[in-house]
């Protein structure tokens, strides 16, 4: 039996919003596997969804740049919004992006090594930790990018589309957060995991398994549509799907990348009272 630590319970509470005892029970039943605990809590109805894990938990900027038939996107993190707007921090991020584009670098460790000296100097000057977090590139016939402030950046690659359409698609991706291009692109493990969750929920309604399975088939079609770009309602004209929009223009999306500042990073919250108490004991 895995040890159920306080930190593990705290993480599950933050990710689900459930009570401490419910989290501890779920972790015990899942033998300490937090992902399995979340699945079980969804199935039991203890939570409706486990989406808090994607909450923004760090600051910084997203930068994008298109160079011919290749586009790059970069995330550089700092600790506060104040520093994220600092001219020196912005210039550092721009310099890192330019280096990635010039050298066609998509390995973040290469960029970290190349800019470590400058990063350390900037940390000393600004007084906050700075991290070159991730970089990616996208190739395509027609490329478009969109930035929502400095916190969300999107790249889209398409065929048969003009620049205006690709820009609109990038804006859609920024707003609607699709995970795949088409419903058929949704990976088998994601489909299977969601299918089992939905089947358990349907079975709990007391319906026969055959009817429950038919109910789940409809839900799965809706699910794969919701998480895919072409299956989503187009944000600028919700009466049609993105797939219908592309068909009207005889165009196709070949790929996209969406970065949001701090997604997936847990922000450390300082307990001021505990910190003061600890300092008192040391003195």
Curated annotation (Swiss-Prot):
Its main location: cytoplasm. Pfam families: EF_TS (PF00889). Residues 80-83 are annotated as: Involved in Mg(2+) ion dislocation from EF-Tu. One of its GO terms (cellular component) is cytoplasm. This is Elongation factor Ts. Keywords: Cytoplasm, Elongation factor, Protein biosynthesis. PROSITE patterns: EF_TS_1 (PS01126), EF_TS_2 (PS01127). GO terms for molecular function: translation elongation factor activity. The keyword Amino-acid biosynthesis does not apply. The gene is tsf. NCBIfam families: tsf (TIGR00116). It is found in: Cytoplasm. Associates with the EF-Tu.GDP complex and induces the exchange of GDP to GTP. It remains bound to the aminoacyl-tRNA.EF-Tu.GTP complex up to the GTP hydrolysis stage on the ribosome. Belongs to the EF-Ts family.
């Amino acid at each position: 039996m895995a040890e159920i630590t306080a930190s593990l319970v705290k993480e599950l509470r933050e990710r689900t919003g459930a009570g401490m005892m419910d989290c501890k029970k779920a972790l015990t039943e899942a033998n300490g596997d937090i992902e399995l605990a979340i699945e079980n809590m969804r199935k039991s109805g203890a939570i409706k969804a486990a989406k808090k894990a994607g909450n923004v938990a760090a600051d910084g900027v997203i930068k994008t740049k298109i160079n011919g038939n290749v586009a790059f996107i970069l995330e550089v993190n700092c600790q506060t919004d104040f520093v994220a707007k600092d001219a020196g921090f912005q210039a550092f991020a721009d310099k890192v992006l330019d280096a990635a584009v010039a050298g066609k670098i998509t390995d973040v460790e290469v960029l970290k090594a190349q800019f470590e000296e400058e990063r350390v100097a900037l940390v000393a000057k600004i007084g906050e930790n700075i991290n070159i977090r991730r970089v990616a590139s996208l190739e395509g016939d027609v490329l478009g990018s969109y930035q929502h402030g400095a916190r969300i950046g999107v790249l889209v690659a398409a065929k048969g589309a003009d620049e205006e359409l690709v820009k609109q698609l990038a804006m859609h991706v920024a707003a609607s957060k699709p995970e795949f291009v088409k419903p058929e692109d949704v990976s088998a493990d994601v489909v299977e995991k969601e299918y089992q969750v939905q089947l358990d929920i349907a079975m709990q309604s007391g319906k026969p398994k055959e009817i429950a399975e038919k109910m789940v088939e409809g839900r799965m079609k809706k699910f794969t549509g919701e998480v895919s770009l072409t299956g989503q309602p187009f944000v600028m004209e919700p009466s049609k799907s993105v797939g219908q929009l592309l068909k009207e223009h005889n165009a196709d999306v070949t790929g996209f990348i969406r970065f949001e500042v701090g997604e997936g990073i847990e922000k450390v919250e300082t307990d001021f009272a505990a910190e003061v108490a600890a300092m008192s004991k040391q003195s």
